Amino acid sequence: GDDVLVGGKGDDYLEGGAGDDTYIYNPGDGADTILDGGGSDTIKFGAGISKDDIVVRRAGDDIRISFKNSETDSILLRYNASNASYFIENFLFDNGETMGMQDILDLSLIGTDSDDVIYGYNADDTLRGGKGNDTLNGGEGNDILYGGDGDDKLYGGNGNDTLYGSEGNDALYGSDGNDILEGGSGNDYLEGGSHNDTYIFGRVDGADTIYDNHGNDTIKFKEGIGKENITFQRVANDLVLKYGENDTVRINNQFGGSSIEQIALASGEYITASKINKIIEDLNAYASNNGMSNISMDDMKNNPDIMQMFTSGWGN
């Protein structure tokens, strides 16, 4: 039948069964669990709860609704993250506002001002961390992840994902698929994972580090960065690119088998890993022939012969 279920105070379990059921939830009702697999079902929130008060997160196969003004109140919707037959279809608020399950699922992908942990679904999702030090997990599908402010961790998961670290010292992991990673400002760590990944860098992006040992990978520099702005330096097995006063990209183990295969500019010019290797060899020979050692990046910039080496290997 069409039942009305009121758990009241305490941590309750409510199961409406078949029919169009209504669940009543008021502030202070505790941590309740709802399981409902039939009909068109509704949660009605009492006075004091509006759309702006709720926080939604995925919890495995479930959806958890919590409340910004309470540390103890919550509603766990069993299987609502994985099986549409268990969906609660309608959410009604005392002030007349309404939401559907898709609204709830969308809200679960948006962070708060706190440190959030957000999980995507088996679809093409967009996750937004907002403020705080957030952790975003895209899961399946071709996802877009925005870290926002704070020191965030972004995991693309399966699919061709796009990861934006934005502000802060972020860590971006593409995992499977042909991913695009852009750390943004701050000193970021970027790891594309398997397949063919692209790393995007622009002015004032800070001191970033890349590790990638799979696929055919590319670094792309944004508008305003030309070949004359970029210097190369080998440090042990790493390759360090300097392209601004405080802007660098360190490619871990570039000369030990974990290489970036190509560096490209917005102009369409590019240089391959083999050409970079040749430049490094020529630079070492030049330094030896001229009695130079421990050449700094600034020394390179001020030496026209060295800069000619750096710019000569680029093609269109």
What are these regions (language model features)?
Residues 1-62, 71-87, 115-119, 124-238, ...:
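Acidic, glycine-rich calcium-binding repeat modules characteristic of RTX/beta-roll
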Residues 66-108, 242-316:
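Low-complexity acidic/polar repeat-biased segments
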